[in-house]
Amino acid sequence: MGYEKSIEAYKKAEQLMPGGVNSPVRAFKSVDMPAIFMDHGKGSKIYDIDGNEYIDYVLSWGPLILGHENPQVIENLHKAVDKGTSFGASTLEEIKLAELVIDRVPSIEKVRMVSSGTEATQDTIRLARGYTGRDKIVKFEGCYHGHSDSLLIKAGSGVATLGLPDSPGVPEGTAKSTITVPYNDLDAIRKAFELYGDDIAGVIVEPVAGNMGVVPPVEGFLQGLRDITNEYGSLLIFDEVMTGFRVGYNCAQGYFDVIPDLTCLGKVIGGGLPVGAFGGKKEIMDEIAPVGTIYQAGTLSGNPLAMTSGYETLSQLTPESYEYFNELGDMLEDGLKKVAAKHNVPMTVNRAGSMIGYFLNDGPVTNFEQANKSDLKLFSEMYREMAKEGVFLPPSQFEGTFLSTAHTKEDIERTIEAFDKTFERITNK
């Protein structure tokens, strides 16, 4: 398997874009291999510019829950493009997608469409602060909520630490309005509220953490957050940009039966086009302009192409789709555990529906500290060998893999076989 064309393309890209990419992970630095440039996808497969075929478990980092080039999505996108790409005014497509989202997401009575997950989270934080009249936000170590200043915060030591900037360019004053605590740790949350409860506008959480690998909530964690925020009059915010419509038909909140005050969405609801959304109770959402005084706007918010792609994607998902995801997920999870044990490779497999994370350590992995104990050198070796076997995985130990309705049992069998061959090679060097 060669990457000659990708290598040449990357050399040119480096002269034009910082690091040669428009999102850092695409540089493949953490796995020490050339950045792969993709050409096209179909079903569960993706093809690079050198002509290599891969079973795709990245799926554009989650949005393509129906796989690549879904016929219904593509057909209706063509029809939408023929009408025009953007109008700067409302369209019927916005209503169709909004109705579907409100019907399926338990917490959402009204929804505002935006153009990215980062927009959704930053606007939700502003809304929470404006609605409560409080400034502080609680987030969790290892949870990523986009790249807005108030959420790019590094966790400090101790139980509840006022944030320090995790990136140059984030003012320390902004960071101090964010409290970071360990994921899955209710004692830390209680301590944070004992210290700052009257100033906390809300708690934002990934109901299944997906940016330290896949880390599901321990039993009682989400309900505990619901109870504590209710006690202190703070808002509970679920960042379901990744988990929305992926963990379950009614999102993670339906799957775990814990209902937040506000929900952030993205990825799947755009079917591969740029999109985000946030929604919640009417009384909170009606604080947003033009009804209320909390300002939010966007040139391309609710654009007809993303609305069409999102509607045509969600309309094809049924409860049976998630039964299929669980069938494939069980198969892949069991297979990974067996081949890892066969070759004495330390591996912990976490899964929530069609999100699967594998950590090269002995586990368990329930928080960011435990995820960080993974063998990154071994992961890098594994990644390169899996690419040679025609399996496209996220080029980072701290990202999850995804399934689609286009994946087949044959894909899963081939993937398990590829892991078997890979572990055979890297453990016998």
From Swiss-Prot:
Domain of life: Bacteria
Pfam families: Aminotran_3
One Gene Ontology molecular-function label: transaminase activity
EC number of the protein: 5.4.3.8
CDD domains for this protein: OAT_like
One Gene Ontology biological process: protoporphyrinogen IX biosynthetic process
Keywords in alphabetical order: Cytoplasm, Isomerase, Porphyrin biosynthesis, Pyridoxal phosphate
Pathway this chain belongs to: Porphyrin-containing compound metabolism; protoporphyrin-IX biosynthesis; 5-aminolevulinate from L-glutamyl-tRNA(Glu): step 2/2
Enzyme superclass (EC): isomerase
Cofactor dependency: pyridoxal 5'-phosphate
InterPro entries from the UniProt entry: 4pyrrol_synth_GluAld_NH2Trfase, Aminotrans_3, Aminotrans_3_PPA_site, PyrdxlP-dep_Trfase, PyrdxlP-dep_Trfase_major, PyrdxlP-dep_Trfase_small
Positions bearing N6-(pyridoxal phosphate)lysine: K267
PROSITE patterns linked to this entry: AA_TRANSFER_CLASS_3
Disulfide bonds: none
A GO CC term assigned to this protein in UniProt: cytoplasm
Keyword Isomerase: yes
Reactions performed catalytically: (S)-4-amino-5-oxopentanoate = 5-aminolevulinate
Compartments in which it is found: Cytoplasm
Record PANTHER family: GLUTAMATE-1-SEMIALDEHYDE 2,1-AMINOMUTASE, GLUTAMATE-1-SEMIALDEHYDE 2,1-AMINOMUTASE 1, CHLOROPLASTIC-RELATED
Family assignment from sequence similarity: Belongs to the class-III pyridoxal-phosphate-dependent aminotransferase family. HemL subfamily.
Record text on subunit structure and interactions: Homodimer.
Name assigned to this protein: Glutamate-1-semialdehyde 2,1-aminomutase 1
Protein's organism: Staphylococcus carnosus (strain TM300)
